[in-house]
Structure formats: C-alpha cells, structure tokens
C-alpha cells in the first residue's frame, strides 16, 4: 500500500526569551510530518540545527524533496540508507515508527525492543543570563523538584555562574554546557574547581573540529560530546576523547540511528545523555525511548515552551512521565 507524506512549519513560543551560546530565540521553529496509509497516520517532528546552518527554508526544501520521492523512502530502512542524518530525516523517521506501531497495533516499546519505563529523571536547562537571573531561575527549578540542572556558561564567567548557583542550592548536581566555546587551557583551569561545586558532567568544551587534544587530557569531570557526535560511525574515535555522548534526534536523523548510536556507545564503554532541540512532546516522545537507556536526560524543551501539544508528556518533581501510545508510538 502506498504512503502519503505531508509536512507543515510551526513556531512554538518560549515562556521567556531563551539564550543559547550561538543565538537567542523567542520561539522554537519546528516542522511536523504526517505519513498516512489512508487508514493510519504516523507523526514526527524536527527542529533546526544551528550548527548545520539549517533554516526553515532549507529544511522545507529537504522535506519537499523527500515528499516528491517518497515512494522510494517509505520504509525506515530505505530512508536511512538514502537520506543523510539531518533534522528533516528525523521527522520522517519518527513518523514512520509511529505509523508502524499503529498499523501493527503494538507500542513503540514492543516494536523497538526497549523495556518501557514509566518515568525518568530529567534535568532542566538554565539559559545564559546574568548570574543573579540564572540563580533565580535555578532556585525556581529546584522548588519544582529538579535536582539536576544544566547550566549554559561561557568560560569567562562559568566559575562565577556555577559558584553563585551552587552556593544557593546545596546538594543539587550540575551539568555545564560549554557549547564548544572553551579552550583546552580554560578547561584544565576550570574542571577541578567545577568538580568541587558538584558539576557531574561538562558538555562539549572544545570546538568539534579541534577536540583531538582531549585524547591526552584526563579530566576530573566526565566530558560529554555534543556537537562532535551525530551518528554511530563516529563512536570509535569519540571513545578516545570523551567519556559520554549526547544523543539528539535531529543530529542522528531519527530514532533509528539514535538507537544504533546508543548501542555503539555502550559497547565502547561510554556514558549516555539524551538531549533535545526545542521540541514539543511530539518530538520528545521518541527521545524518551532513547532516554530510558541513558544516564542523563536533557529532555526539557516542552517545559520551556509557553504551551505543549495536547496529550503531551507531564513533568513533576524532576521526573518526566512516559507518553501514552495514543499520543505517539
């Protein structure tokens, strides 16, 4: 039976202006993909990768090209064999997973062969701002039950930022996201001092094109690859430089490759973090599946939006609760 693919562009406003290392956003730019067999509809979602300079126009062009040639891409195997890892492929791949579940009358957990977990601990991201504003946001997050906070920090003010927040929140653990902006010298200076402040992970300290020196550096805090890591083929090299990898569906090009990446990372002794990219619960439902296999879960973007999709996942006390199969998968 032939399948039909449709897509639409949407913008979902954030609760407050969100500052990343590379940009500031008022809303999350997202694409929704529907794949239908005439009876069932599978849904998927993707965002934009600033690292790849993706724009709404470029992703729309990629989706339109896939739509026009969909007869040859209507299985996950064909899609992942033909289309490179990119955000557009993510939305289509996840829609095909959802459709497969609906046609088979089985859950994503059964189809993917992953044991269902009813809830998982997640962090919440504190965006770049003044130390006082970040401290206030961090205290508000802890008041809602979060015990693991992800702090985005430039090297020049990372110590001040983390010190200010840690002093106000004893016992809370932190992930520091450097977003490729540190030098090796700054990392060596900051890491021992951040360890004393209960920082448990440093994410992507060096630029992805200049992270080879990490192979010779024994960090007191585990280092996690983000921009350096997209697909399973990179794992043998990354295992020489990092202690963990951050999996994101837009980077892997969907759930299919994300599961392969998670397996490869574990086989090489790496820790796992599941991230997100401004998604609603529709984009983060497949992330939850991979997140159930991970040590850290940065699946919080739906909480940063002014509103989520109807029927989406709930977060209470720093725990993210599993989606219902009627919503996705």
Where is each model-derived feature located?
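Residues that form or immediately flank small-molecule/cofactor binding pockets and catalytic motifs
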Residues: 10-12, 127, 228, 301-304
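N-terminal capping/lid subdomain adjacent to the active-site entrance of alpha/beta enzymes
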Residues: 1-174, 181-188, 192-196, 309-329
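Catalytic core of soluble alpha/beta enzymes
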Residues: 151, 156-285, 289-292, 300, ...
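Anaerobic metallocofactor- and corrinoid-dependent redox/one-carbon enzyme cores
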Residues: 296
């Amino acid at each position: 039976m032939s399948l039909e693919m449709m897509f639409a562009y949407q913008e979902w406003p954030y609760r407050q202006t969100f500052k990343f290392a590379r940009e500031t956003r008022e809303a999350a730019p997202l694409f929704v993909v529907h794949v239908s067999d005439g009876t069932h509809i599978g849904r998927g979602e993707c965002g934009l990768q600033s690292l790849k300079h993706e724009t709404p126009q470029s992703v729309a062009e990629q989706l339109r090209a896939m739509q026009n040639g969909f007869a040859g891409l209507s299985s996950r195997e064909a899609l992942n064999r033909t289309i490179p890892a990119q955000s557009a492929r993510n939305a289509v791949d996840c829609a095909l997973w959802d459709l497969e579940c609906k046609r088979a009358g089985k859950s994503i957990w059964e189809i993917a062969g992953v044991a269902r977990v009813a809830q998982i601990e997640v962090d919440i991201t504190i965006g770049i701002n003044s130390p006082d504003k970040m401290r206030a946001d961090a205290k508000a997050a802890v008041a809602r039950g979060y015990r693991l906070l992800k702090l985005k920090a430039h090297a020049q003010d990372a110590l001040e930022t983390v010190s200010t927040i840690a002093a106000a929140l004893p016992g809370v653990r932190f992930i520091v996201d450097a977003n490729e902006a540190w030098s090796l010298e700054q990392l060596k200076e900051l890491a021992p001092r951040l360890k004393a402040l209960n920082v448990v992970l440093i994410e992507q300290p060096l630029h992805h094109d200049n992270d080879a020196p990490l192979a010779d550096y024994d960090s007191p805090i585990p280092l996690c690859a983000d921009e350096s890591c997209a697909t399973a083929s990179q794992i043998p090299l990354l295992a020489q430089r990092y202690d963990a990898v951050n999996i994101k569906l837009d980077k892997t090009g969907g759930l299919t490759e994300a599961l392969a990446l998670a397996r490869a990372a574990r086989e090489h002794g790496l820790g796992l973090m599941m991230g997100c990219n401004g998604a609603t619960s529709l984009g983060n439902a497949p992330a939850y599946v991979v997140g159930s296999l991970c040590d850290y879960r940065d699946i919080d973007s739906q909480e940063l939006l002014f509103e989520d999709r109807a029927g989406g996942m709930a977060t209470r006390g720093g725990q993210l609760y599993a989606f219902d199969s009627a919503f996705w998968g």
